[in-house]
UniProtKB/Swiss-Prot annotation:
Compartment(s) of residence: Host cytoplasm; Host nucleus
A single GO molecular function term of this UniProt record: zinc ion binding
UniProt name for this protein: Small t antigen
Organism: JC polyomavirus (JCPyV)
Zinc finger annotations (H1C3-type) as residue ranges: 120-141
Residue ranges constituting the J domain according to the UniProt record: 12-75
Zn finger residue spans: C4-type: 101-114
InterPro entries: DnaJ_domain, J_dom_sf, Papo_T_antigen, Papo_T_antigensf
Modified residues (N-acetylmethionine): 1
Pfam family, one: Papo_T_antigen
Keyword Hydrolase listed: no
């Protein structure tokens, strides 16, 4: 996510969206702010045309960069996306046993927290640069990116963001 726009462009986009810069990377929040600002800045509604054009350019560049970086087969379906082996209880979908899954993920646990953390460990050996939020959706990358402690409140925020994220983006 930190390579989609340069630092100046990302700060400018967050300012245009009216969001705190700490929200950078929270795509659902950025999308809602973008749609709201489109209504405010639209020239037909008395808004600033130049700001609207710049915001559209930066947002589309960010959106396209995320698609290219994280969805090389954008628009196609993978067989792993059609069905899943999660337990039927939605409470255990994200984290089966708090805080055990957060501190010591298990290969035998079907929760997203364990699967994403184990996937993170495997992927970090294949890359020369460190994994960051949006490259990796694990709870640790989320906490590091947004500066959260290991708390249930952070867990609930992570669950909310994952709930708004398409399954294919998780790269499981």
């Amino acid at each position: 996510m930190d390579k989609v726009l340069n630092r100046e462009e990302s700060m400018e986009l967050m300012d245009l969206l009216g969001l705190d810069r700490s929200a950078w990377g929270n795509i659902p929040v950025m999308r809602k702010a973008y749609l709201k600002k489109c209504k405010e800045l639209h020239p037909d509604k008395g808004g600033d045309e130049d700001k609207m054009k710049r915001m559209n350019f930066l947002y589309k560049k960010m959106e396209q960069g995320v698609k290219v970086a994280h969805q090389p087969d954008f628009g196609t379906w993978n067989s792993s996306e059609v069905g899943c082996d999660f337990p039927p209880n939605s409470d255990t979908l994200y984290c089966k046993e708090w805080p055990n899954c957060a501190t010591n993920p298990s290969v035998h646990c079907p929760c997203l927290m364990c699967m994403l953390k184990l996937r993170h460990r495997n992927r970090k050996f294949l890359r020369s640069s460190p994994l960051v939020w949006i490259d990796c959706y694990c709870f640790d990358c989320f906490r590091q990116w947004f500066g959260c402690d290991l708390t249930q409140e952070a867990l609930h925020c992570w669950e909310k963001v994952l709930g708004d994220t398409p399954y294919r983006d998780l790269k499981l």
